[in-house]
Swiss-Prot record:
Family under the similarity heading: Belongs to the MntP (TC 9.B.29) family.
Subcellular location(s) per record: Cell inner membrane
Protein's name according to its UniProt entry: Putative manganese efflux pump MntP
Organism annotation: Syntrophotalea carbinolica (strain DSM 2380 / NBRC 103641 / GraBd1)
Domain of life: Bacteria
Statement: the UniProt record of this protein carries the keyword ATP-binding: no
Pfam assignment, any one: Mntp
Length: 188
């Protein structure tokens, strides 16, 4: 695989991570270096691991994964997006104690949801006989960088527009989930 194709693939895979990070940046009261590192590291790591897992699985589980991957991504994104919208309507005291999307189960759910497409890429690489190791590294690095950029842009917008942007962040996640479901069920 040539470098231009690889970078194009990595950027395409990073778009979901970027959009989700944008939504996360919108919801955080105060964005710290730890938030940036945690989300960037996890999204990058999951984006790098999933092609490797898909490549190792090869053809044996391809049909099963293709049948359910979009439902898993949809469910995870709708749950987290719905939670973000719900939290936007809470009073100020409750909002301060809410879950941080860069920690715990929210972090794991978002990491899995944004990297499922990379699993399919790994399967595809196995089918055409391309080694996965270098592409996985590039995919992970670009996803991590795009995640940090998304969080920074989201935080900037969140500081300016507050609750409305927080609701938009949840709607973005739900929209991404619906897009994934739409593309996979209708084959678009």
């Amino acid at each position: 695989m040539d470098m231009i194709t690889l970078f194009g693939l990595a950027l395409a895979l990073a778009m979901d991570a970027f959009a989700v990070a944008l939504g996360c940046g919108l919801t955080l009261e105060r964005l710290t270096g730890r938030h940036l590192f945690r989300l960037g590291w996890h999204f990058g790591l999951f984006q790098a691991m999933m092609p490797i897992i898909g490549w190792l699985a090869g053809l044996t589980v391809q049909k099963w994964i293709e049948t359910y991957d979009h439902w898993v991504a949809f469910g995870l994104l709708v749950c987290v997006g719905g939670k973000m919208i719900h939290e936007a309507f809470q009073d100020e005291e409750t909002r301060e104690s809410r879950d941080d999307p860069t920690r715990g189960m929210s972090l794991i759910m978002l990491s899995v949801a944004t990297s499922i497409d990379a699993l399919a890429v790994g399967l595809s690489l196995a089918i055409v006989g391309i080694s996965v190791w270098f592409p996985a590294l590039i995919i992970g690095i670009i996803a991590g960088v795009m995640t940090v950029i998304g969080m920074l842009l989201g935080r900037r917008a969140g500081a300016r527009w507050g609750q409305r942007v927080e609701i938009a962040g949840g709607l973005i996640l739900i929209g991404i989930g619906l897009k994934i479901l739409w593309e996979h069920t209708l084959g678009m």
